[in-house]
Design a protein with these regions (language model features):
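Short small-residue beta-strand/loop micro-motif enriched in glycine and branched aliphatics
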Residues: 81-82, 177-182
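Acidic-enriched catalytic cores of C-N bond-cleaving enzymes acting on peptides and small amides
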Residues: 136, 152, 161-162, 181-233
Length: 233
């Protein structure tokens, strides 16, 4: 948790300097502060886009593997090197500066813009649900852009349609209560093959999950979704 409070204040300060109204939201001593930012559109006040980012980073150890101090932000060529440069401070500052440039150029934004910048993403966002419940109205929006993005080999932005989840499962198969000689393989079943058969019931050769009910809550792509995907280069 080193530097969490200081970093949240710094991010809020950067937002304000960029013309974005900002405040620090809190839940208590055991939760990292959340930085909130907002710009209201004059011409399109009924549509809101929210950017999600985080200001916390992974630990810097082992330090001896770094060529330069991890928080030096050293620039080599046109790239910044340092802890959090790509996860997730680089993306965050890019979005902030994009909004700042738009405001300076046009004096307005194309729709309401909101920023939700948390400080616990790297340890599982353990309090984000509490923040969402407490500040539901403040965080309301029509669409969310997640924390990062990619470009392809031709430097074209890649549009992601979602994020995968994580599921940890431990499978245990048992047969003999003690270690036995391989010569008994014809009469004592090998539990490893039980695991192989179990795994084979979970997913087919094309990657489709075979577990009953797995896709029940998945919304199918609409015709418009498919048309947009087909138009992508």
């Amino acid at each position: 948790n080193e530097g969490i409070e200081e970093c949240s204040l710094l991010v809020s300060k950067i937002l304000k300097k960029s013309g974005i109204k900002s405040e620090i939201l809190r839940l208590g001593k055991n939760a990292a502060p959340l930085v909130y930012g907002e710009v209201k559109s004059k011409n399109n006040p009924n549509t809101t886009l929210l950017f999600y980012n985080h200001y916390d980073v992974q630990p810097v150890e082992p330090l001896d593997l770094w060529d330069d101090p991890p928080f030096s932000g050293k620039i080599i060529g046109n790239k910044i090197f340092g802890r959090g440069a790509s996860d997730d401070k680089g993306e965050l500052i890019t979005r902030i500066k994009a909004v700042e440039s738009y405001l300076k150029t046009y004096g307005d934004v194309p729709c309401n813009i909101k920023f939700v910048i948390e400080g616990e993403e790297e340890n599982g966002s353990e309090n984000i649900e509490r923040y969402l419940k407490k500040y539901k109205k403040k965080f309301s929006c029509d669409g969310v852009v997640w924390e990062f993005g990619y470009v392809d080999q031709k430097n074209r932005p890649i549009i992601g349609l979602g994020m995968k989840g994580l599921l940890y499962v431990e499978l245990i198969a048992k047969e003999s209560v003690r270690d036995v000689h391989s010569s008994f393989a014809v009469i004592i079943k090998n539990p490893a093959w039980k695991l192989v058969r179990a795994l084979n019931t979970m997913r087919d050769e094309n990657g489709k999950v075979l577990i009953k009910g797995w896709y029940d809550d998945i919304m199918p792509l609409s015709k418009n979704d498919i048309n947009l995907i087909q138009k992508e280069p």
